[in-house]
Amino acid sequence: MWWLLATTCCVLLSGPIDGYKQESITNPEANMNISELISYWGYPYEKHDVITEDGYILGTYRIPHGKGCSRKTAPKAVVYLQHGLIASANNWICNLPNNSLAFLLADSGYDVWLGNSRGNTWSRNHLRLSPKSPQYWAFSWDEMAKYDLPATVNLILEKSGQKQLFYVGHSQGTTIAFIAFSTNPELAKKIRLFFALAPVATVKYTRSPMKKLTTLSRKAVKVLFGDKMFSTHTWFEQFIATKVCNRKLFHQLCSNFLFSLSGFDPQNLNMSRLDVYLSQSPAGTSVQNMLHWAQAVNSGQLQAFDWGNPDQNMMHFNQLTPPVYNISKMRVPTAMWSGGQDVVADAKDTKNLLPKIANLIYYKEIPHYNHMDFYLGQDAPQEVYGDLIRMIEESLQN
């Protein structure tokens, strides 16, 4: 967000502008963590630590019921929501309750769980490794699919007493599901339905800024970004979110930053909540994860991380080159939504993905949707969530 630095300095140096103070309103949620935000809207919550097989500790949040529901009821069907790249569980609760999927599901009578990927703001602990060490950050979406997703699903089912759950993934949250559900048959049996929002398998045609990483060598990327964390939320970005982007004067500038990452759809963004949207973004990931995405852009395949030389690949995969994941092996019933203005999950990549989904039960392309509309869009309840909840209800009746 360096482009905002000059703007901020100009604002601070120039002093008051006509109407400037009157337009400065910060939403209280912009300074809240996940548990505080859930409580703020009157919902109950639980915080659980998922411990993966390789020692990562993942912060997982539960909304066991809606505002008007009693805790003392029969076991509820479980819905597990998993965010995308450099994001967090905050995505599912950052809008008003009538526009946030997690709250809508809770009010519809479901037991809602919000996952956080390793290395983000809420999942930055380990049984043995320090986040200050490069060893902690030696992961990508391979490990999220192999370790994070199974561990989280198993804990959720254990705590809820259920045998299956409904899985909702956005962006990278769909990527790790495609991998996990196609390579781990026992895990796949525990998924009743898979809802894929802005699904990402290949990124051959992506137009997102991450494509710029492909112009750099691995060595250059590590010189620029190091070998640990990539793009975490800083005090400066929090300042921009709560002191600049909360002002109507800068709504267009701040929203254009979001659109540059996701695609253009200004009519569908609640500008009055820009400070909330930006206050916990980005939530961070590993440099290795970003290198893996750059590899995916170059290869045009959904492939395991290339460790850089045949010996390393042989050690990890028992073959000289990283294996390609075969999504067609996934048998989980799957519903998908894609966006016509999505610069991350490009329409051509989605078109190539569709025939590989062996049990596709529903697909909808929304022409005006960008990558973030699936959790930020003001019309998401009408375009996506209504049908998603209906499919859950129909599945439970069968």
From Swiss-Prot:
GO terms for cellular component: extracellular region. One of its GO terms (molecular function) is hydrolase activity, acting on ester bonds. Its EC number is 3.1.1.-. Glycans are attached at N270, N326. It is found in: Secreted. Keywords: Disulfide bond, Glycoprotein, Hydrolase, Lipid degradation, Lipid metabolism, Secreted, Signal. It comes from the Eukaryota. PROSITE patterns: LIPASE_SER. GO terms for biological process: lipid catabolic process. The keyword Signal applies. Gene3D superfamilies: alpha/beta hydrolase. Pfam families: Abhydrolase_1 (PF00561). It is an enzyme of class 3 (hydrolase). Residues 78-377 form the AB hydrolase-1 domain. The active site is at S171 (nucleophile), D342 (charge relay system), H371 (charge relay system). The keyword Hydrolase applies. InterPro entries: AB_hydrolase_1, AB_hydrolase_fold, Lipase_euk. Plays a highly specific role in the last step of keratinocyte differentiation. May have an essential function in lipid metabolism of the most differentiated epidermal layers. Belongs to the AB hydrolase superfamily. Lipase family. This is Lipase member K. The lineage of its organism: Eukaryota, Metazoa, Chordata, Craniata, Vertebrata. The gene is Lipk.
